[in-house]
Amino acid sequence: MCPHALIPFKPAGPKSRLSGILSPEEREAFARAMLEDVIAAARDANCSPVIVATELFDSEDVQITIADKDLSGTLNEVLSQAAGPVLILMADLPLATGPAIKRVASTTSDIGIVPGRGGGTNAIFVREPAKFHVDYYGMSFLKHIRIAQEAGLSCEVIDSFLLHTDIDEEDDLVELLTHGSGKSRKYLEDLGFVLSAENGRVGVKRPVQPAPAT
């Protein structure tokens, strides 16, 4: 049985670095689609998803906790009160699958961690939450390794393409359109996004661009 899966989520104004190709409304809808893909993957791994949101939003059949501190502060408060193992997953991992999440939760170490690109932390399993705290700003991957070491906790770094692939930049959409199969890929395809190859590089294009924000 997998643990509770905490999924931090920002409903309003997400993914600003995609503003060149998605309108504000489209970015919010896309972020929701990615969240739903992550929730589905967590449930496929027999985890119980809990959304840690910056504000209340409509979501059916999932528990929502409102963050009353910054991300790290809120998650650390939850960790301090947890009665058992906890898994933290980012909400922008649309390639996540049940087996990939189970791999993280099945580590025999005290901590299992999947790094993100740019030094971030995309997924982290904490066997004994009272002995660990998170710090999600800056080079969080190295911070979490250090925090585990200082607490005397064993730590496994897990190599997972599906959980390593987060979506922040336009180029990241290539991986989603190539490997994705969930709601977030369908959302992009419904908007007209397709893969394109120019000068030997694969990218994405959208025949009709969104109107600029006013």
From Swiss-Prot:
InterPro entries: CofC, Nucleotide-diphossugar_trans. Gene3D superfamilies: 6.10.140.50, Spore Coat Polysaccharide Biosynthesis Protein SpsA, Chain A. SUPFAM superfamilies: Nucleotide-diphospho-sugar transferases. It is an enzyme of class 2 (transferase). Signal peptide: none annotated. It catalyses: (2S)-2-phospholactate + GTP + H(+) = (2S)-lactyl-2-diphospho-5'-guanosine + diphosphate. Keywords: GTP-binding, Nucleotide-binding, Nucleotidyltransferase, Transferase. Pathway: Cofactor biosynthesis; coenzyme F420 biosynthesis. The keyword Nucleotide-binding applies. Coiled coil: none annotated. Its EC number is 2.7.7.68. It holds the Pfam family CofC. One of its GO terms (biological process) is F420-0 metabolic process. GO terms for molecular function: GTP binding; phospholactate guanylyltransferase activity. Belongs to the CofC family. Guanylyltransferase that catalyzes the activation of (2S)-2-phospholactate (2-PL) as (2S)-lactyl-2-diphospho-5'-guanosine, via the condensation of 2-PL with GTP. It is involved in the biosynthesis of coenzyme F420, a hydride carrier cofactor. Homodimer. This is 2-phospho-L-lactate guanylyltransferase. It comes from Methanoregula boonei (strain DSM 21154 / JCM 14090 / 6A8).
